Amino acid sequence: MADTGDMEHIFKRFDTNGDGKISLAELTDALRTLGSTSADEVQRMMAEIDTDGDGFIDFDEFISFCNANPGLMKDVAKVF
């Protein structure tokens, strides 16, 4: 699993406008970089990660997702 520093680095790369949260557009751009462009897949991931339903992924939600998906995060860390 990526360590907290790696997760913070990845979060900041996804959060392109630096507002401390990842929007649907930012998630779409990040997943496109990883080779995923399906709008349905992006929507599904957003719904899964955005546990409070505010339309954004905050750092705590991102950490929870990373901890639940360590294999995926290793792959993401290699790209970012």
UniProtKB/Swiss-Prot annotation:
Q: Which residues form the EF-hand domain?
A: 2-37, 40-72
Q: Which domain of life is it from?
A: Eukaryota
Q: Per its UniProt record, what InterPro entries does this chain match?
A: EF-hand-dom_pair, EF_Hand_1_Ca_BS, EF_hand_dom, EF_hand_pair_protein_CML-like
* Keyword Transport assigned: no
Sites where the protein binds Ca(2+) 1: D15, N17, D19, K21, E26
Listed binding positions for Ca(2+) 2 are D50, D52, D54, E61
Query: Which Pfam families does its entry note?
Result: EF-hand_7 (PF13499)
Q: Which GO terms describe its molecular function?
A: calcium ion binding
Sorted keywords for this record are: Allergen, Calcium, Metal-binding, Repeat
User: SMART domains attached here?
Assistant: EFh (SM00054)
Q: What is this protein called?
A: Polcalcin Cyn d 7
Q: Which organism is it from?
A: Cynodon dactylon (Bermuda grass)
